Amino acid sequence: MADLKTNLLGFTMNSPIIGASGTVGYGVEYEELADFAKIGGISGKGLTLHGQYGNKGERLWETPSGLINSIGLQNPGVQHFIDVELGEMLELKQKYGTVAIANLGGHSEEEYVEGAAMLSDSAVDIVELNISCPNVKVGGMAYGVKAEAAGEVVRMVRDACKKPLMVKLSPQAENIPEMCKAVEAAGADAISLTNTFQACAIDLEKRRPVFNNTFAGLSGPAIRPIALRMVW
């Protein structure tokens, strides 16, 4: 069998495959379903400083070539993650060598910074910054849309976090190459592409959008060629 070991930010991984945030929980939920010895790392379910219940109404909708989700960043909060779920991820790392990655979102610069500082003092290996979250100070526009806003929040988090910092970009960014340069200049050690693509589903019987928020995130085979274009 081919040796697929690779290095990510100083960590040797079994393979280049990382369980994407939001798809594998915190890893332990899928331990009996997947061969973790072939997985390089786990990016845990997206966190916010304080726990969130997530969105009401329909949350998942299958498409012919993917899945649309409207979970709403349901999570236990950073401190609960450090106290409970991180330990489970580190147990998986001890068993299989999977790198433990914490995915962090926020609704203000202050939330990002405080959450990052807490994770910086924890045993997590890498912090993945989710900048697709809405900035409540500018009418809800995601941090990941404009390079200037993205660079600013990454710069603030970089100052507060000594862990290797990966920034997960939104495909809704105005200009992906400019965004990459902005977050790199602000201190990002790596870039993750991409988050889900904004999508919509219609309930034909009710003649209205499936999701309470109208739009939700599309993932799956349908977005792979588009994501690869962005990487290229």
Regions found by a protein language model. Give the residues of each.
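Alpha/beta enzyme core
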Residues: K95, H107-W232
